[in-house]
Regions:
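Sec-dependent bacterial lipoprotein signal peptides
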Residues: 1-20
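Acidic, polar-rich low-complexity tracts and alpha-helical solenoid repeat scaffolds
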Residues: 20-305
């Protein structure tokens, strides 16, 4: 009887796997069909349909490390053609970050640099991308004049350039942050970490970029940077603080209380002896309460004593 049950379950698994593979192959066939339409001169609506097919595939089959970076690159190239540069940038960054070891990554890097240089007019980010590409993809210097020329440009190393920007963010004695320089630092640190993820200074730069994003109240970017640090550099010494501050940002600034609760609980389970543990317990106990409610709870505790 057990043998029959095992064989039945095995058959179910094989049928399910075959169905999934069939769906995936069908999705690829539909993409190929739409690519042929676009190659024959599709209008913007037709092009956008193909973009959505690419993105749907990468969402539905994230484990396909061969097709996904190629599809993300093609989606970005089409969005570039449609003048949708922010979306193109986002898809290129996703392709590089999630599929860094893919052979198409250098192409994504070069198109990303083109967007920052020619379309977004962010020359600092563009030059940092080229410096990082020269570090991480030295083979590009043999084929790309931009990459080769950046090596002889006389620019200081990226970490030094970003340190200079960080020191210039507070130009006067008022303590007010220079928003343009803050944005330069956040973007510069992000693209450097993206292109040269193994750089010695990358974890510290991401941490400082997250702090800067929080200072200028770019809270969604703050969470993104903390997640990047926590997920990719778990052994970095400031990861506990990053996890706590992620929870605090979700709690205090974004009011996403259930997400904050999960982060505080994870922080306390992982780092119960951390310097921020008492703060996390207090914030968890008082999650969602107003200042008045917290004061009243103090008064009630004192009265009981």
């Amino acid at each position: 009887m057990k043998t029959i049950s095992y064989l039945f379950c095995a058959c179910i698994w094989v049928v399910g796997l075959s169905a999934c593979q069939g769906e995936q192959q069908h999705a690829q066939s539909e993409i190929s069909r739409q690519e042929a339409v676009v190659e024959n001169g599709g209008d913007p609506e037709t092009v956008n349909t193909l973009v959505q097919q690419y993105l749907a595939y990468t969402t539905n089959y994230p484990e396909d490390s061969e097709a996904n970076p190629r599809y993300l690159y093609r989606a970005a190239a089409l969005q570039y053609r449609l003048n949708n540069y922010d979306a193109a940038r986002n898809n290129l960054e996703k392709a590089i970050r999630e599929y860094y070891d893919n052979e198409n990554t250098p192409n994504s890097v070069l198109l990303l640099e083109d967007i920052y240089q020619d379309k977004l007019k962010d020359r600092m980010a563009s030059s940092i991308i080229m410096q990082a590409a020269a570090e991480s993809f030295p083979e590009l210097a043999n084929h790309q004049e931009k990459v080769a020329s950046i090596q002889n440009s006389g620019l200081a190393p990226v970490a030094q350039r970003l340190d200079a920007v960080a020191r210039a963010m507070y130009p006067d004695t008022t303590g007010r942050i220079d928003l343009r320089r803050a944005n330069d630092f956040i973007t510069g640190a992000s693209v450097y970490a993206l292109i040269s993820p193994d750089g010695d200074q990358v974890p510290e730069l991401l941490y400082k970029a997250a702090e800067t994003a929080r200072t200028v109240q770019a809270f969604t970017k703050t969470i993104e940077l903390y997640d990047w640090l926590i997920d990719h550099y778990p052994d970095f010494e400031k990861v506990p603080q990053a996890m706590f501050l992620k929870g605090f940002t979700l709690d205090n600034d974004l009011r996403r209380l259930e997400e904050a609760r999960a982060i505080y609980e994870d922080f306390l389970a992982t780092y119960p002896q951390d310097d921020f543990a008492d703060d996390a317990r207090f914030l968890l106990d008082n999650l969602g309460k107003t200042d008045e409610e917290i004061i009243q709870s103090f008064d009630g505790t004192q009265a009981e004593q």
